[in-house]
Amino acid sequence: MDKIKEETTTPGKIWKTSITKSELSQLPAESYHGNIIVIDRAEAAVEACEILRREKILGFDTETRPTFKSGQHHNVALLQLSTHTECFLFRINIIGMPKCVLDILEDEHILKIGVSIHDDFLNLHKCYKLEPKGFIDLQAYVKSYNIADNSLSRIYGILFDKRISKGQRLSNWETQVLTQCQQEYAALDALACITIYEYLNKDGFDYRTSKYYREFDDPNYQQAQQEKTT
């Protein structure tokens, strides 16, 4: 059994579970081993939704073409819904939002897990009038496990000592054909949401035994000290 760390009280310090950028970069890369189905036809979307509706839990994510100019904006290009074994990549920049996908996103009886999904919802509501139901945002969920980090890659690194590469994040998600690297990146992000949620619920996570649970500088303390001297 891992040893539970004893917290000490040090002025200007705070205990939290967090992984540094340097530590994360040194972890071995995670890879995707499931099936990937790219949906770029309306008929294929209907078939995919029939499979997805059989599941009790789905991983959710989206990808958007990056912007490099001030004032430039792109709508969501790719919407990922993952089961435990396969991920469906809906190219909504090509086929629009299929009604069957919208129905799943608005079904409170199908649990969907994502990370930092507020902005996704705003964009999808603006374009497709989405009213999301049945979602859990890991960004808020992990706080009850004393995990201070809120990005998917850092949460995954803390729990599994594996690194999810973000190398494809700024690639062109509106390209005519998605590369294999893009597909695997998108699929892994969605699957990782399920993996994290189920690990926390089924296996449990005692942050007091984590090697990433330790003292960090308390920014509130530092600010208070500065205010005292001014």
Residue ranges and their predicted role:
Residues 1-58, 138, 191, 205-230:
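N-terminal accessory regions of nucleic-acid-interacting proteins
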Residues 33-46, 53-60, 66-188, 192-199:
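Conserved DEDDh/DEDDy metal-dependent 3′-5′ exonuclease domain
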